[in-house]
């Protein structure tokens, strides 16, 4: 846990009512901060959006930065959970990639403010910005490395590959989903996956240049 996270460690409510109220505040923060930006969003607006008294906010979060950090962590957890559930039981890495990308785009279509929230994290709290991407990459790296061992995909640096694939997801989603406010067209998704399949395709080791043929 980073220093900034330790300073803002927040005890989660134990009652069902408390958890509902906390989630309402996080949902409101996603809407307000995603729309207005962190600097222009206010706690008053967040509580009004959530339908709770302003004082209620401070029962759950000490300040606006704290709710922002929790929002980033909540979005990260929800995204990773949805992808994990979608690919559970799948064995083929290329199929996992296809289902994983579909799930990512469905999630970002549902949480349209995710892009803006995560981009702002770099300037609000750099530690949580790095944590978001590293946490997302951790499982990805493990899965890619396992697929390389099974010779399902070509052998590359799994961390480098994970970040390349994450970059594809982010920018394709931004161009064809966030900017147009519509789901990604099937033809764009298919072309993206054709590129990924070609890049990941397993290549048996080539013979040495000096090998003699019969």
Model-assigned labels for residue ranges:
Residues 70, 81-110, 161-165, 189:
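Hydrophobic alpha-helical connector segments
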Residues 38-39, 152-154:
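Conserved hydrophobic residue
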Residues 1-9, 93, 106-110, 142-149, ...:
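C-terminal peripheral helix-coil segments that are non-catalytic and often amphipathic
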Residues 55:
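Key DNA-contact positions within bacterial/archaeal DNA-binding proteins
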Residues 19-27, 39-40, 51, 59-84, ...:
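An amphipathic alpha-helix adjacent to DNA-recognition modules
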Residues 1-36, 44-49, 66:
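Basic, helix-initiating cap at the start of DNA-binding domains
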Residues 61, 118-124:
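Short helix-capping/turn signature of helix-turn-helix
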Residues 77-81, 125-150, 159-163, 171, ...:
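Amphipathic alpha-helical packing segments from all-alpha helical-bundle domains
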């Amino acid at each position: 846990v980073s220093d900034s996270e330790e300073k803002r460690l927040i005890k989660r409510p134990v009652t069902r009512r408390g958890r509902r109220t906390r989630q309402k505040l996080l949902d409101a923060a996603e809407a307000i901060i995603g729309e207005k930006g962190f600097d222009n969003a206010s706690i008053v607006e967040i509580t009004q959006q959530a339908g709770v008294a302003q004082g209620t906010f401070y029962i759950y979060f000490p300040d606006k930065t704290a709710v922002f950090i929790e929002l980033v962590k909540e979005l990260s957890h929800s995204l990773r959970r949805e992808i994990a559930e979608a690919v559970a039981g799948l064995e083929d890495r290329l199929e996992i990639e296809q289902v994983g990308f579909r799930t990512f785009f469905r999630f970002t279509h549902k949480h349209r403010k995710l892009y803006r929230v995560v981009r702002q994290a770099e300037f609000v709290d750099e530690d949580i910005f790095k944590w978001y991407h590293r946490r997302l990459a951790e499982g990805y790296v493990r899965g890619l490395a396992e697929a390389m061992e099974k010779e399902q995909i070509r052998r590359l640096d799994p961390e480098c590959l994970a970040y390349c694939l994450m970059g594809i997801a982010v920018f394709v989603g931004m161009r064809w989903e966030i900017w147009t406010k519509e789901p990604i067209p099937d033809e764009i998704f298919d072309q993206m996956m054709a590129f990924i399949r070609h890049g990941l395709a397993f290549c048996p080791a080539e013979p040495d240049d000096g090998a003699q043929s019969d």
